[in-house]
């Protein structure tokens, strides 16, 4: 006797399943996604087309294909997420490339540079194409850089992105060969420098930042040590510590301020710069130099201020000093500004911690 399996109980074959899936996919192609999802929770996954998993090395992009690519950042204002508010700075930070710089004493130097480029974004614009900032900058990257070249790069990406405000900042480590105090040796000192060009409301400002590392001997500790020696015959040594000042200056329009010029100014203000090459005679000289120039953090800020005020090429400026105490478990800090460029009601919470320079 033959037993027939009811059709309802028979499992569909693979061929039948493939045919059913093809029908489902054809239907889904012309059906709103919400209707597909309403059919069954697993339906969207079933009808998703099979995709190639091999990279198409031979594929080339023509103008028609390029025009078809979605561009969300240039979409309508309806795509804006959150408040329709002006963004003061939007762009890219820390893209690196080798850049040649003009110097006062050593011709042109090529240095690894970290670049930050930003523009303002109007309230009704969704976003920017950030790659344009890099492309605009790279168009000038083979030139020896000065503020004039930075200005041309800024003009390019400000125009490309149709923005009213823009900024470029370039950070690098600037090498200078410096002599020891007495032994006649020389060594390379490296200075963290940043160049910044700001265009805001049609007004442009050229700004230079420099981190200067020096030794600060506490005047109070020096006097107390001398008191112990004089009054009690007790040997005592004053405390001193590695200290850092971040000097930021606005270079007046049409003026040229070399990196080395700013270094000369800060060295004249505080002569106890940390040393590179040191023999015993240099170490003794450094002890004598520190004893001759004891300095509180307030003194340091005002000494730098006096030197900067003396140079007619410098407009507004800011001095941020940190004496990283060897006596205390805290640091002594000061901030001095002149002019509106660097004035601020609030300080970056990490401002002073960013002044630590690890050897």
UniProtKB/Swiss-Prot annotation:
Keywords noted in UniProt: Hydrolase
Entry EC number(s): 3.5.4.16
Signal peptide (UniProt feature, chain positions): none
Catalysis performed (reactions): GTP + H2O = 7,8-dihydroneopterin 3'-triphosphate + formate + H(+)
An MF annotation (GO) of this entry: GTP cyclohydrolase I activity
Keyword Hydrolase belongs to the record: yes
InterPro entries named among the record's database cross-references: GTP_cyclohydrolase_FolE2, GTP_cyclohydrolase_FolE2/MptA
Pathway entry: Cofactor biosynthesis; 7,8-dihydroneopterin triphosphate biosynthesis; 7,8-dihydroneopterin triphosphate from GTP: step 1/1
Positions bearing the site annotation: May be catalytically important: 218
Any single GO BP term: tetrahydrofolate biosynthetic process
Enzyme class label: hydrolase
Role according to the record: Converts GTP to 7,8-dihydroneopterin triphosphate.
Protein family membership: Belongs to the GTP cyclohydrolase IV family.
The protein's name in its UniProt record: GTP cyclohydrolase FolE2
Taxonomic source organism: Cereibacter sphaeroides (strain KD131 / KCTC 12085) (Rhodobacter sphaeroides)
């Amino acid at each position: 006797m033959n037993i027939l399996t009811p059709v309802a109980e028979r499992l569909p074959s693979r061929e039948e399943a493939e045919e059913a899936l093809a029908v489902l996919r054809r239907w889904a192609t012309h059906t709103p996604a919400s209707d597909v999802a309403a059919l069954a929770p697993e339906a969207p996954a079933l009808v998703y087309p099979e995709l190639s998993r091999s990279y198409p090395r031979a594929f080339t992009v023509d103008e028609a294909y390029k025009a078809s690519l979605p561009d969300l950042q240039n979409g309508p204002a309806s795509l804006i997420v959150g408040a329709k508010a002006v963004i003061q700075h939007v762009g890219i930070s820390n893209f690196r490339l080798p850049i040649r710089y003009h110097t006062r004493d050593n011709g042109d130097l090529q240095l690894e540079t970290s670049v930050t480029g930003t523009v303002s974004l109007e309230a009704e614009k969704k976003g920017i194409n950030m790659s344009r900032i890099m492309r605009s900058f790279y168009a000038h990257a083979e030139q020896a850089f000065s503020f004039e070249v930075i200005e041309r790069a800024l003009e390019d990406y400000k125009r490309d992105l149709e923005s009213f405000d823009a900024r470029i900042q370039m950070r690098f480590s600037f090498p200078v060969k410096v002599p020891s105090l007495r032994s006649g040796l020389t060594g390379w000192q490296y200075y963290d420098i940043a160049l910044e060009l700001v265009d805001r409301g049609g007004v442009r400002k050229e700004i230079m930042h420099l981190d200067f590392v020096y030794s600060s001997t506490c005047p109070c500790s020096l006097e107390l040590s001398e008191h112990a020696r004089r009054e009690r015959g007790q040997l005592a040594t004053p405390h001193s510590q590695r200290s850092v000042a971040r000097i930021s200056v606005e270079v007046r329009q049409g003026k040229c301020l070399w990196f080395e010029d700013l270094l000369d100014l800060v060295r004249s203000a505080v002569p106890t710069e940390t040393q590179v090459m040191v023999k015993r005679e240099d170490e003794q000289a450094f002890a004598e130099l520190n004893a001759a120039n004891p300095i509180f953090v307030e003194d340091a800020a005002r000494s730098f201020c006096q030197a900067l005020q003396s140079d007619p090429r410098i407009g507004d400026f800011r001095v941020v000093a940190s004496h990283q105490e060897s006596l205390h478990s805290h640091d002594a800090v000061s901030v001095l500004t002149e002019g509106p460029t660097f004035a601020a009601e609030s300080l970056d919470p990490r401002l002073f911690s960013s002044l630590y320079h690890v050897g």
